[in-house]
A protein has these predicted regions:
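Sec-dependent N-terminal signal peptides
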Residues: 4-13
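Solenoidal tandem-repeat scaffolds enriched in leucines and small polar residues
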Residues: 148, 152-205
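Extended hydrophobic/aromatic-rich secondary-structure runs
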Residues: 1, 73-80, 316-321, 334
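Beta-barrel outer-membrane channel/assembly domains of diderm bacteria
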Residues: 16-113, 120-144, 163-176, 183, ...
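Sequence/structural signature of outer-membrane beta-barrel proteins
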Residues: 34-42, 69-75, 95, 102-117, ...
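Positively charged n-region of N-terminal signal peptides that target proteins for export
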Residues: 1-4, 341
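Electropositive, surface-exposed helix/loop patches at the edges of structured domains
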Residues: 102, 133, 139, 172, ...
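Exposed, low-structure sequence patches enriched in small/polar residues
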Residues: 44-50, 203-217, 222-572
């Protein structure tokens, strides 16, 4: 189908020129090029070399983009020495057509947001075609294509899994100032790989996403709301007596997502608020595999807002939250504005958690309870995350010295191994020996019998979870000199805590015969322990990170930066 589409579009380019063969002359086109080269080496043989060249051609109503990559090996993924990306575009009046690697963003990405992130080897573009009709107050987009995504497994550098999506999607957007409306639909047939390498073990899944969004713009505020509903079904195929292949769909999972944001402006100050509730899958706090074995939930086309601050400092980025796009709710508030002396202030707070609290009835059986209302919880079994950030920046010395200082803190429960709080029956058996024999210099017991059983009801509490928190202070100074020269100085200090927290009057032992958690001390059921241990080597209480950077440069010409980063203990 795609080849036929290209054959239909290509003659338009030929016919639009008097000399048809002139399109093969490089001087015929307006063009530009860009090159990205990355190289890295380390003492543990982690070597990579990445080279990418982008070429952009444009002439009249036509444009084209090519990307050639020579990476052997890349930082992440498999080696490539070939044309990696291409796209041609043609527009005429209200119509535009694209063929090749398509990147689109609809709404805030609850249905579709396509991007290419080389840093994490993520690319959810679709190779196919897109047709768009745009008039004064309406835009209609229809696209179809195929996406092949690679996923890491046990090997953290080379992908071991592959997911293939064939999609058809439509987006309609209406403009009626001060309102804007949108409707989205996406259907994907996914071939989902379950086992790495070797013999392929796959499952066929059909995903259907329906979404709607609306925005409103006022004189001192704006509002955006988006909601989507998702259904997934497993696909099986059977051949009937006539030799026809019949598709059968079986319901698999159903989920939804809601997102809201609003900006309020008052003079030099602005208040930003956003809220999310994503619910596509529910896994207990021990099971974190939302990708390989638990399928039918969020798909890679859904790149949704995360609702915590995207940091540009490496220390703050290291402590960032690992978002859960399948099961998470929360909000973020940011207040920013200018002071009378010209300084700028930014403050931000974020609170996230899962949609349920969890209780481990046994080490392998969990019960969940939905969190009431709309807001997140601080209950540790819902894996809460809290973040605070404050920044002050501005200029001194007649605007020659630019400074930025900040403080960032966060706290998170990353994993819950067990949590039970309630009544439990404890059964004690009393045995007596009924037969014995003297042999050598000692008695040997040959038989015994139970004489009594005591049952007691105790209040049980047992919990074991992992908790992390951090405290970071970065400072950046940049002094402007004459003739465009500048000198920069950066300092940063960070403390990171990673702890195991163990509490309760029962430990991790469970009696499956009696279906009860075993007390630490059966003679004293009320005896409870409270223990916090560090996850860092040698029981180091916390990690201290420090960074020093010095940079010298000339505007629009060159820059040289020296970074020195040291820590008191390495990660496990």
């Amino acid at each position: 189908m795609y080849k036929n589409f290209l054959l239909a579009v290509f003659p338009l380019l030929i016919q639009s020129e008097k000399d048809a063969f002139s399109i093969f002359d490089l001087d015929f086109w307006n063009y530009n090029a860009g090159i990205v080269m990355n190289f890295g080496d380390s003492y543990d043989d982690f070597t990579y070399m990445e080279n990418r060249m982008d070429l952009n051609f444009f002439k009249n109503n036509f444009s084209a983009w090519l990307q050639y990559e020579y990476s052997d090996p890349p930082e992440l993924g498999f080696s490539i020495k070939d044309l990696r990306k291409y796209r041609i575009e043609y527009s005429s009046g209200p119509w535009s057509i694209k063929y090749g690697d398509i990147y689109e963003v609809w709404g805030r990405g609850l249905v579709l947001a396509q991007l290419d992130d080389q840093g994490i080897d993520f690319d959810n573009s679709s190779r196919g075609y897109l047709i768009n009709y745009l008039s004064d107050n309406i835009s209609v987009t229809q696209m179809s294509g195929e996406t092949v995504n690679a996923q890491l497994g046990a090997d953290l550098r080379h992908p071991e899994f592959e997911f293939t999506h064939n999609i058809d999607a439509t987006n309609i957007n209406f403009e009626a100032y001060p309102f804007s409306y949108g409707l989205s639909f996406l259907q994907s047939n996914e071939l989902h790989q379950l086992k790495p390498l070797g013999v392929m073990d796959t499952v066929d899944i059909n995903h259907r996403l329906h979404g709607a969004y609306i925005s409103w713009f006022g004189s001192n505020m704006d509002i955006f709301i988006e909601y989507m509903d998702k259904q997934s079904k497993s696909r099986t195929f059977q051949t009937n007596f006539s030799g026809q292949e019949i598709e059968s769909l079986t319901p698999l999972k159903r989920g939804s997502a809601a997102y809201f944001n609003s900006n309020y402006y008052l003079g030099n100050w602005s208040l930003f608020f956003e809220y999310k509730r994503y619910s596509f899958d529910r896994l207990n706090p021990v099971d974190t595999d939302y990708i390989i074995n638990n399928y039918g939930n969020r798909i890679d086309y859904q790149v949704m807002p995360i609702l915590y601050r995207e940091q540009n400092h490496s220390f703050l980025g290291r402590a960032a939250h690992q978002t859960n796009a399948n099961d998470e709710r929360g909000y973020q508030v940011e207040l920013s504005g200018g002071l009378s002396n010209g300084f700028q202030v930014v403050t931000q707070f974020s609170h996230l958690s899962r949609n349920d609290t969890w209780e481990s009835i046994s080490p392998i059986e969990w019960n969940r309870k939905n969190i009431s209302g709309l807001l997140p919880t601080t209950n540790f079994s819902a894996l809460p995350y809290l973040e605070f950030y404050a920044e002050l920046n501005g200029y001194l010395l007649n605007n020659r010295l630019q400074f930025k200082t900040a403080i960032g803190t966060n706290e998170e429960v990353t994993k819950v191994n067990r949590f039970f709080k309630g009544l439990s029956n404890t059964i004690s058996e009393n045995w007596t020996y009924t037969d014995s024999i003297w042999y050598g210099e000692d008695w040997f017991y040959l038989d015994s019998q139970i004489v009594s059983m005591d049952t007691s009801i105790n209040q049980i509490e047992t919990m074991l979870y992992q908790k992390s928190k951090s405290f970071t202070i970065p400072i950046d100074l940049t002094l402007s000199l004459k003739n465009g020269y500048s000198v920069g100085l950066g300092l940063a200090y960070q403390e990171r805590y990673k702890n195991n927290v163990k509490k309760g009057n029962a430990g991790g032992f469970y009696n499956y015969a009696d279906s009860t958690w075993i007390l630490n001390d059966e003679t004293n059921p009320n005896h409870s322990s409270n223990e916090t241990t560090s996850n860092y080597p040698n029981e180091t209480p916390f990690q201290i990170n420090r960074m020093f950077s010095l940079s010298i440069g000339k505007a629009s010409k060159w820059a040289l930066t020296l970074n020195y980063d040291w820590t008191n203990v390495q990660e496990i």
